[in-house]
Amino acid sequence: MEMNSLYIDGKAVDATSGETFVSINPANGEPIATLGQASSADVENAIESAKRGFAVWSAMTAVERSRILLKAVEILRARNNDLANLEVVDTGKPLQEAIEVDVASGADVIEYFAGLAPTLQGDQQPLSDTQFFYTRREPLGICAGIGAWNYPIQIAMWKSAPALAAGNAMIFKPSEETPLTALKLAEIFTEAGLPDGVFNVVQGDYRVGQMLTAHPDIAKVSFTGETGTGKAVMSDSAKTLKSVTMELGGKSPMIIFDDAKLDDAVSASMVANFYTQGEVCTNGTRVYVHESIYNDFIDQLKTRTEKLIIGNPMDMETQIGALISKEHLSKVLEAIELAKQSGATLLTGGYQVTDNGLANGNFVIPTVFTDCHDDMPHVQQEIFGPVMSVLKFTDEDDVIRRANDTQYGLAAGVFTQNLSRAHRVIHQMQAGICWVNTWGDSPAEMPVGGYKLSGVGRENGPETLLHYTQTKSILIELGDYASPYA
């Protein structure tokens, strides 16, 4: 596939660094496209373009901006299948997921913030008969979005939607593992009427990200990725006092009580570990099951997990796709071997799939370990693959303590038919995204983000729009100025 690498000032352009990288199809190891790494000059061009675009975009009324964003939503939905197919080739995830979720959920978020944009307003308060003040919610300026490789186009839309709705410009850097669909999103924004420069795309590795996080003309950075990189991004951003949003890693607990609907609990645990072949930051990889239903749970879990279809992601029957890269495949397989050595019981899975034409891809069979303990490496560390750890519990207070005993705090879930217990337990979970009797839903209206080392700030929901604004206070004197000097 031939394509320009960058999108700057309303058009696709080539990078000028002379360096290139190759996007690889995770399902077969074949190259998809060769792209150019952005140079410092390219990044400067993107920033200068964004300044010009911001001047035009921020001067528009919120209703005018909303109309353009809604037009982009219309185009995105019309091209859902084409975009989903490209996303599958780039990520290795099953087409049945991408065609239903990835583009659609991102378009929903743009639509949500387009509708919310005209509600941005300030306050007014009288101070005396002759004096009052009012406030304005003003855009920050140029924002940087740095995406991850598991949901490339969805993340690009989640980050650009509130930024653009509030009147900002955005420079977006997708992961170098999945660079393709962000360029398509930029084209669609332009087609919808977005002024040139308001959404630019630069490509490359961590060096390009560092150019953005260090640049004094970038007002805010929104980053999705692993916690170690997030710390570095936040540190770089602090040098110029940038606002930051960080959506980072997790090792989330799911607690299944003895009165839970067993079928639902098993279904949710499978979704929470095997959807997108386990490459989801909110995965509920620590599944705590009450001792009285433990055997029934793992019996059903084993039977149903072994029926999952792993194969060519482009086949609509496929439920488990390919991991993003050979390097990541090796990390997941290493984590599985450590789990075996730790004393956990391998219930099912535990190996790379190489038959049925999958030998050149990065396929790992859905894997479940039982008889796990909290101090085992695979229970403590984020694996980001299709690996579930099942642990027993008997006491409510004890399982709450165990569930919270982690450096992460992204998500948590509780399964019970006791409404009082559901609220009591979920209120004690140290996590930013919590579910009761379900897992994984993330509607545009709901703020999402982490506690502890899982992040800073929120994405989606009404408060996120405010994160892309700054408050200006204006005091008005209607009478004579009272000078303290004669």
Swiss-Prot record:
<dbReference type="InterPro" id="IPR015590">
    <property type="entry name" value="Aldehyde_DH_dom"/>
</dbReference>
<dbReference type="GO" id="GO:0019285">
    <property type="term" value="P:glycine betaine biosynthetic process from choline"/>
</dbReference>
<dbReference type="Pfam" id="PF00171">
    <property type="entry name" value="Aldedh"/>
</dbReference>
<feature type="binding site">
    <location>
        <position position="455"/>
    </location>
    <ligand>
        <name>K(+) 2</name>
    </ligand>
</feature>
<keyword id="KW-0560">Oxidoreductase</keyword>
<dbReference type="InterPro" id="IPR016163">
    <property type="entry name" value="Ald_DH_C"/>
</dbReference>
<dbReference type="InterPro" id="IPR016161">
    <property type="entry name" value="Ald_DH/histidinol_DH"/>
</dbReference>
<keyword id="KW-0558">Oxidation</keyword>
<dbReference type="InterPro" id="IPR016160">
    <property type="entry name" value="Ald_DH_CS_CYS"/>
</dbReference>
<keyword id="KW-0521">NADP</keyword>
<dbReference type="GO" id="GO:0046872">
    <property type="term" value="F:metal ion binding"/>
</dbReference>
<dbReference type="InterPro" id="IPR011264">
    <property type="entry name" value="BADH"/>
</dbReference>
<feature type="binding site">
    <location>
        <position position="382"/>
    </location>
    <ligand>
        <name>NAD(+)</name>
    </ligand>
</feature>
<comment type="similarity">
    <text>Belongs to the aldehyde dehydrogenase family.</text>
</comment>
<dbReference type="InterPro" id="IPR016162">
    <property type="entry name" value="Ald_DH_N"/>
</dbReference>
<feature type="binding site">
    <location>
        <position position="241"/>
    </location>
    <ligand>
        <name>K(+) 2</name>
    </ligand>
</feature>
<feature type="active site" description="Charge relay system">
    <location>
        <position position="159"/>
    </location>
</feature>
<feature type="binding site">
    <location>
        <position position="24"/>
    </location>
    <ligand>
        <name>K(+) 1</name>
    </ligand>
</feature>
<keyword id="KW-0630">Potassium</keyword>
<comment type="pathway">
    <text>Amine and polyamine biosynthesis; betaine biosynthesis via choline pathway; betaine from betaine aldehyde: step 1/1.</text>
</comment>
<comment type="function">
    <text>Involved in the biosynthesis of the osmoprotectant glycine betaine. Catalyzes the irreversible oxidation of betaine aldehyde to the corresponding acid.</text>
</comment>
<protein>
    <recommendedName>
        <fullName>Betaine aldehyde dehydrogenase</fullName>
        <ecNumber>1.2.1.8</ecNumber>
    </recommendedName>
</protein>
<feature type="binding site" description="covalent">
    <location>
        <position position="281"/>
    </location>
    <ligand>
        <name>NAD(+)</name>
    </ligand>
</feature>
<comment type="subunit">
    <text>Dimer of dimers.</text>
</comment>
<feature type="binding site">
    <location>
        <begin position="173"/>
        <end position="176"/>
    </location>
    <ligand>
        <name>NAD(+)</name>
    </ligand>
</feature>
<feature type="binding site">
    <location>
        <position position="452"/>
    </location>
    <ligand>
        <name>K(+) 2</name>
    </ligand>
</feature>
<keyword id="KW-0520">NAD</keyword>
<feature type="active site" description="Charge relay system">
    <location>
        <position position="459"/>
    </location>
</feature>
<feature type="active site" description="Nucleophile">
    <location>
        <position position="281"/>
    </location>
</feature>
<dbReference type="InterPro" id="IPR029510">
    <property type="entry name" value="Ald_DH_CS_GLU"/>
</dbReference>
<feature type="binding site">
    <location>
        <position position="249"/>
    </location>
    <ligand>
        <name>NAD(+)</name>
    </ligand>
</feature>
<feature type="modified residue" description="Cysteine sulfenic acid (-SOH)">
    <location>
        <position position="281"/>
    </location>
</feature>
<feature type="binding site">
    <location>
        <begin position="147"/>
        <end position="149"/>
    </location>
    <ligand>
        <name>NAD(+)</name>
    </ligand>
</feature>
<feature type="binding site">
    <location>
        <position position="23"/>
    </location>
    <ligand>
        <name>K(+) 1</name>
    </ligand>
</feature>
<feature type="binding site">
    <location>
        <position position="90"/>
    </location>
    <ligand>
        <name>K(+) 1</name>
    </ligand>
</feature>
<keyword id="KW-0479">Metal-binding</keyword>
<feature type="binding site">
    <location>
        <begin position="226"/>
        <end position="229"/>
    </location>
    <ligand>
        <name>NAD(+)</name>
    </ligand>
</feature>
<feature type="active site" description="Proton acceptor">
    <location>
        <position position="247"/>
    </location>
</feature>
<dbReference type="GO" id="GO:0008802">
    <property type="term" value="F:betaine-aldehyde dehydrogenase (NAD+) activity"/>
</dbReference>
